[in-house]
Amino acid sequence: MGSTSSLYAAIDLGSNSFHMLVVREVAGSIQTLTRIKRKVRLAAGLNSENALSNEAMERGWQCLRLFAERLQDIPPSQIRVVATATLRLAVNAGDFIAKAQEILGCPVQVISGEEEARLIYQGVAHTTGGADQRLVVDIGGASTELVTGTGAQTTSLFSLSMGCVTWLERYFADRNLGQENFDAAEKAAREVLRPVADELRYHGWKVCVGASGTVQALQEIMMAQGMDERITLEKLQQLKQRAIHCGRLEELEIDGLTLERALVFPSGLAILIAIFTELNIQCMTLAGGALREGLVYGMLHLTVEQDIRSRTLRNIQRRFMIDIDQAQRVAKVAANFYDQVENEWHLEAISRDLLISACQLHEIGLSVDFKQAPQHAAYLVRNLDLPGFTPAQKKLLATLLLNQTNPVDLSSLHQQNAVPPRVAEQLCRLLRLAIIFASRRRDDLVPEMTLQANHELLTLTLPQGWLTQHPLGKEIIDQESQWQSYVHWPLEVH
């Protein structure tokens, strides 16, 4: 029993899919062991009297039999099972739940829309980086949750009865992706939103985060098409035109859209367009977690840290036994360089955060081997779970670590889309120089330096006589100037 007592499971009986998340608590953080998702489409089994059909209930029970096998090893006090919109609505929900509890061997709780919204917000707060004041949007199968909050505290919570399955049945029942169907779906969604829009706007937000299958699908489409990961109304309208061009649901083909997500994509898209329009949202990114993560973190009683990224970096440093003093030393030199060139290069605050994060992890590759350490570092960062960092930011970190030394692979810096290619090049230059000047691993051996930028030309001024007193240092810097010149990055060192 010992090894399973640190396991926790969260199950969410959604209107479109049933999900199970099994995690292990490791040093105040969670490690995902299992994620199982089955499209049960429970909401599609509701008739006009809100009764669930026997077929839909059987689909649900069948899925729970799979989940039950995995739950046998976990203490019941460490399992939470919640049911959402469809089972809130269904007049015969009691029949479904009685049998579900029998199959799973633990209680199933039907939670209110507000409680669902609160849990979603907690899941986002624990796993998503960025500004503290946020609006969270989760489009489910039969309900849509909208929550504003600051840090761990929610300021307003709404659960609206519209979702991608119910809107599919209502506005795309004929499987026709015409303009009229989209117009009707958007108009109806805006009417549902209108009564709550003022309060959401009153509380306000600095960032907007999406936490649902629809937003996940959009992210996959944009990554597949090489776009940056920010969701904007313009991109949503382009995708709508693409869907209209396809004509029918069974013919819907968009690069990066999986068959599994395609069925409810147009209805989810219509709801999201309505939300963007009604609330005047400029830009949305994908959340790191939502309802299931909220359940798990709730069971673990872990507090929400102000800075998720810092917690992630600390955990990774401990796990891979990275020399934290050296990571801080490189970060300090890089920050000093960054602050000197930031105005000339018009860099944004997020770029500084990502550069410092790369410094914190730059030696992770040594945990595999000194040989090819940059390649090992890039592989690890690309494949590790890094709460607080978006997929595009992870890719940028991996690319910076790949190019921390040796000749520069310019194409890799251009293939990430977290920042413009030119910014990726600039961050790479600063990281490489910081690593060189902190390489003696002692604070008192880092020279006083000034770094000036004039367009792409970097001029580094060292203390008088430093180069003659440090022949190895001079050799390394000469080699670096040469490598930077190969990719047209002019570097002068005095």
Swiss-Prot record:
Gene3D superfamilies for the chain: 3.30.420.40, Exopolyphosphatase. Domain 2 (3.30.420.150), Hypothetical protein af1432 (1.10.3210.10)
Transmembrane stretches, start-end: none
Keyword list, A-Z: Hydrolase
Biological process annotations from GO: guanosine pentaphosphate catabolic process; guanosine tetraphosphate biosynthetic process; nucleobase-containing small molecule interconversion
UniProt KW Hydrolase keyword: yes
EC number: 3.6.1.40
Pfam family, one: Ppx-GppA_III
Listed GO MF terms: guanosine-5'-triphosphate,3'-diphosphate diphosphatase activity
Enzyme's top EC category: hydrolase
Pathway(s) served: Purine metabolism; ppGpp biosynthesis; ppGpp from GTP: step 2/2
InterPro entries for this protein: ATPase_NBD (IPR043129), GppA/Ppx_hydrolase (IPR050273), Guo-5TP_3DP_PyrP (IPR023709), Ppx_GppA_C (IPR048950), Ppx_GppA_N (IPR003695), PyroPPase_GppA_Ppx (IPR030673)
Reaction catalysis annotation: guanosine 3'-diphosphate 5'-triphosphate + H2O = guanosine 3',5'-bis(diphosphate) + phosphate + H(+)
Protein's UniProt keywords contain Plastid: no
Entries under SUPFAM superfamilies matching the protein: Actin-like ATPase domain (SSF53067), HD-domain/PDEase-like (SSF109604)
Annotated function: Catalyzes the conversion of pppGpp to ppGpp. Guanosine pentaphosphate (pppGpp) is a cytoplasmic signaling molecule which together with ppGpp controls the 'stringent response', an adaptive process that allows bacteria to respond to amino acid starvation, resulting in the coordinated regulation of numerous cellular activities.
Family: Belongs to the GppA/Ppx family. GppA subfamily.
NCBIfam families associated with the record: PRK11031.1 (NF008260)
Protein name, entry field: Guanosine-5'-triphosphate,3'-diphosphate pyrophosphatase
Organism in which the protein naturally occurs: Escherichia coli O6:H1 (strain CFT073 / ATCC 700928 / UPEC)
Gene that produces this protein: gppA
